């Protein structure tokens, strides 16, 4: 079984072979990899930096293979990711340019079929920037703009039952 780690000193994602040997698999501003609940897969975004279009990568920790799970779609890029279960991830996808769209909307992606299902449908007034699972609920937060020129904002939070995601 392979492992994966983030080296904060070099800011790289490294694949760890069963022998202990390491190989850098991402060096362009990657996120810290997150493992699936059963620890057989990992996901990370690279690069994730201002106005740079990154990919969401899936790493199979059983064989060490890596693939792009979500690539930029026009100007829309993956910005944050968590695991829903062993077969699905939840990813924030949003506009990649400018200063207004700091977040985006939540999508569920099946890791086997790469089928993408939109969970939230906010316009640019609401920008989701973070998400987490707790007590069978999907919690998410970000900002809601309060003026017409999208300059002033307040904190925004909401929650969705994981059971309701089955209907999407």
Which ranges hold each PLM region?
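Terminal domain-start segments
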Residues: 1-59, 153
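Eukaryotic scaffold repeat domains enriched in small/polar residues
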Residues: 2, 78-79, 84, 133, ...
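Multi-bladed beta-propeller domains
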Residues: 14-30, 62-78, 112-126, 162-168
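Blade-terminus and WD-like Trp-Asp/Gly-His loop motifs, strongest in beta-propeller folds
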Residues: 33-42, 80-88, 130-136
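A generic tandem-repeat structural signature
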Residues: 61, 67-69, 79-81, 86-111
């Amino acid at each position: 079984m392979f492992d994966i780690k983030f080296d904060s000193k070099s800011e790289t994602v490294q694949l760890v072979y069963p022998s202990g040997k390491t190989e850098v698999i991402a060096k362009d501003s990657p996120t810290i990899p997150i493992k699936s609940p059963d620890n057989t897969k990992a996901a990370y975004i690279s690069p994730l930096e201002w106005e740079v279009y990154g990919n969401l990568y899936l790493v199979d920790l059983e064989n060490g293979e890596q693939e792009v799970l979500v690539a930029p779609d026009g100007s829309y890029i993956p910005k944050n990711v968590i695991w829903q279960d062993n077969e699905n991830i939840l990813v924030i996808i949003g506009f990649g340019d400018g200063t207004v769209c700091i977040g985006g909307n939540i999508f569920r992606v099946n890791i086997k079929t790469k089928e993408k299902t939109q969970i939230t449908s906010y316009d640019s007034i609401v920008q989701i920037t973070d998400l987490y699972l707790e007590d069978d609920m999907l919690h998410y937060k970000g900002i809601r703009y309060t003026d017409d020129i999208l300059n002033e904002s307040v904190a925004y939070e909401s929650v969705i039952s994981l059971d309701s995601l089955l209907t999407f």
